[in-house]
């Protein structure tokens, strides 16, 4: 009987994830941001979108790499609009707040331009997401990003978004944030 218990314990131990690997961090969501002026921006040159903005975020963070995709499009009536798409290169999660950054892949004319996106998962009380922040060469707001961006993301938080936050349209979706486990 003791050999059976030992084998069972060994199988259970091997089935558990390695403590050195930790759990993956996650940020997922889709929705529509309300138009208007963002709340709590850090930068002084904030734009107030006149139209709703659709977004989609899928990001995963492992101990040694971050992957994912961000997409967004302005919902201008009667216009198809371009989808801005980028590969996620960094992710920083603190509690229910996340920031992701990377390089645009679409539209082609902006391929390689760094971007940043902030979000706060407030559960049923209403999530917040920032408008897409683009940082071409010479952009004055580049000083608000850490050295090494887009491989290293800035800190997230309600008062940390460079361009502030827009509320999600009720019933349009949401954001889910899970910090990585050590």
Task: Cite the ranges covered by each PLM segment.
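Extracellular secreted precursors and ectodomains with disulfide-bonded cysteine-rich loops/domains
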Residues: 35, 46, 88, 150-152
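Short polybasic amphipathic segments
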Residues: 68-72, 125-137
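C-terminal partner/receptor-binding element of secreted or periplasmic proteins
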Residues: 130-182
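Bacterial N-terminal signal peptides
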Residues: 6-17
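C-terminal region of N-terminal signal peptides and the immediate post-cleavage residues
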Residues: 15-30
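Short polar catalytic/cofactor-binding loops
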Residues: 31-39
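Predominantly extracellular/secreted and cell-surface proteins with exposed
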Residues: 40-123
